[in-house]
Amino acid sequence: IPLCLVGSEMCIRDSPDIWSAARSIVRDNGDRSSGVDLPSLSHARITSVTEGGIGERACVDLTERLLEGEGIVAGSTSSCLSLIHGETIPSQYVPTRPFRINAGAIHSYVIMGDGTTKYLSELESGDRVSVFSVDGSIREATIGRLKIERRPLLKISFESGEFTGNVMVQQAETVRLISSDSKPISATDISQDDEIIVVIDNSMRH
């Protein structure tokens, strides 16, 4: 329903600046840097990109929109997770779905709002996950729906110092990780020696 100011021709529905400001307020209010102790962002080097066969991948649909540069962290090991970007970027194949993160294979770990981890397969409507931003802020968001389908996968392996990890994601250009210069990069364009943003913490618990 469009909301208009009395005596004004301006409708909130038609003002992207107002929506942007509103989302910024939500993000700032949700920043829990002084609350739950969560790991910070690091960089990792891609060591290999290989086919991962056919498997079940999970799209996590939130009850609110993501901003560019935001996503959730996921991976095959809880100590080394990669930042998966939300579907906020236009594509010639599908429309944007700014509430969605195509987070990868169902065995992957994700960080919840309370700092614990769950497998993607365990997530349910109403669960709270941690949303990470390239600017270092972290907020919570509620899951509205989980969409699991069989798709071809890519296994993207990486290392950061003594830590190694991998993430298995759908082989699709709309699935994006985030490069070390804070720009989204399609999973189908990632190559060996590229650098991506990850979260590293060997104290993660499940």
Residue ranges, per PLM feature:
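Short, conserved secondary-structure segments in the cores of folded domains
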Residues: 1, 116-119, 186
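Short, charged beta-turn/beta-strand-edge "cap" motif at the junction between a beta-strand
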Residues: 133-138, 198-206
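C-terminal helical cap(s) of enzyme catalytic domains, especially alpha/beta-barrels
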Residues: 18-37
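Hydrophobic beta-strand signal
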Residues: 111, 129-131, 197
